[in-house]
Amino acid sequence: MQTLVFNTTTRTAKLYEGVAEKSEIIVAYTEVPTVKVMDDGFYQVMQLDAMEKQLPVLRVPIANTNMFVKS
């Protein structure tokens, strides 16, 4: 099971292959204001572009993803 870690202080999101901070990072994003929980069963990572507009950059299924929010 993969793990998504969203840090609200540093505004980062990291997706780990397995256990957070003990396994390989699959992908990491900066300038992440929020991670949305979508009605269709996905976590959606939103990132700010140069115009400060939020764009979806990653969708992962809730069914096989643990998510942790750090501050």
Named regions from a protein language model:
Residues 1-11, 18-19, 24:
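Anionic N-terminal interaction surfaces
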Residues 1-2, 69-71:
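Short intrinsically disordered terminal tails
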Residues 16-65:
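Acidic, low-complexity, intrinsically disordered interaction modules
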